[in-house]
Amino acid sequence: MAKHLALSVAAAVAVSWLAASSAAAAGFYEKFDVVGAGDHVRVVSDDGKTQQVALTLDRSSGSGFTSKDTYLFGEFSVQMKLVGGNSAGTVTSFYLSSGEGDGHDEIDIEFMGNLSGNPYVMNTNVWANGDGKKEHQFYLWFDPTADFHTYKIIWNPQNIIFQVDDVPVRTFKKYDDLAYPQSKPMRLHATLWDGSYWATRHGDVKIDWSGAPFVVSYRGYSTNACVNNNPAGGWSSSWCPEGTSAWIHRELDGAELGTVAWAERNYMSYNYCADGWRFPQGFPAECYRK
């Protein structure tokens, strides 16, 4: 489910930040904008160097942040520790979006909470020119609430790669005759919100507010990306930082494609290219291509 729906909640909710120390928060404020209820976010430093951001969700508000810059291609990663216990109905996200319009582009990583003892679902999705419905969903091979794990999006002109702890789990390839996010600059977003209408068992399981507040922690944010703050888009290598060569032409090799196949075989819980009920007139064109 795209965050243009989610953020209609988050935007109304609005979020701001309480910093445990002004020094810890200063660098964060240089990179991100936040709005809203100040007591729903904390920016702290564990060791004087590492920033940790805690987002909170309760009945009154969700929380989130968005990058000041917009990007056209890049490598984006963050470490996250998800909501523990009964997290049913909650949605935690790390994603890129060009905005809320009908023709928007978006690249999603979302975590859909579940009842205690049941696994989280990691939802990946790609939107191009307003066309989404390209979800691959996975259970994880570890408990994402017990410790921090690294989630990464690599977005370049050839493909989009989703990684978990440096393990590729999905690649979405560009085809010249099909829509692909390549012209609209996107901002980075992170949110924690109430997705009861959708997130857990197709909305059958709602948030148990007796367990609030729900908290998710972010740290170790890293980006190597081409900054493009021109709404009209366009791309030039001059906008890209040092180190761009590590990802700008990156495609998965045979061994990495084997890792994707391993993830699909052992942990995939949903593949839009196998959902005939959803696509009775035929699957999207990319489903038929290798």
Swiss-Prot record:
Residues of the GH16 domain: 26-218
Location, primary (coarse class): secreted
GO molecular function list: hydrolase activity, hydrolyzing O-glycosyl compounds; polysaccharide binding; xyloglucan:xyloglucosyl transferase activity
Tissues where this protein is expressed: Transcript strongly detected in leaf sheaths. Weakly or not expressed in leaf blades, roots and calli. Accumulation of transcript detected in shoot apex meristem, vascular tissues, young leaves, vascular bundles of leaf sheaths, and peripheral cylinder of the vascular bundles and fibers in the nodal region.
Compartment list: Secreted, Cell wall; Secreted, Extracellular space, Apoplast
Induction: By gibberellic acid (GA3). Accumulation continues to increase throughout 24 hours of GA3 treatment. Very little effect by other plant hormones like brassinolide (BL), 6-benzyladenine (BA), indole-3-acetic acid (IAA), and abscisic acid (ABA). Inhibitory effect from uniconazole, a potent GA biosynthesis inhibitor.
Residues where xyloglucan binds: 110, 123-125, 133-135, 197-198, 278
GO biological process: cell wall biogenesis; cell wall organization; xyloglucan metabolic process
Post-translational modification, as annotated: Contains at least one intrachain disulfide bond essential for its enzymatic activity.
Disruption phenotype: Plants exhibit up to 50% growth reduction when they reach maturity.
Superkingdom of the organism of origin: Eukaryota
Disulfide cross-links: 226-240, 273-287
SUPFAM superfamilies in alphabetical order: Concanavalin A-like lectins/glucanases (SSF49899)
Signal peptide segment: 1-25
Keyword Signal: yes
Site (Important for catalytic activity): 108
CDD domains: GH16_XET
Glycosylated residues, chain numbering: 114
PROSITE patterns xrefs: GH16_1, GH16_2
EC numbers, comma separated: 2.4.1.207
Protein family per UniProt: Belongs to the glycosyl hydrolase 16 family. XTH group 2 subfamily.
PANTHER family per record: XYLOGLUCAN ENDOTRANSGLUCOSYLASE/HYDROLASE PROTEIN 8-RELATED
Additional observations: Lower level of XTH8 transcript detected in Tanginbozu, a GA-deficient semidwarf mutant, and higher level detected in Slender rice 1 (slr1), a GA-insensitive mutant showing a constitutive GA-response phenotype.
Biological role stated in the UniProt entry: Catalyzes xyloglucan endohydrolysis (XEH) and/or endotransglycosylation (XET). Cleaves and religates xyloglucan polymers, an essential constituent of the primary cell wall, and thereby participates in cell wall construction of growing tissues. May promote elongation of three internodes (II, III and IV) and may be involved in cell elongation processes.
Name of the protein described by the UniProt record: Xyloglucan endotransglycosylase/hydrolase protein 8
Species this protein is from: Oryza sativa subsp. japonica (Rice)
Lineage of the organism: Eukaryota, Viridiplantae, Streptophyta, Embryophyta, Tracheophyta
Gene: XTH8
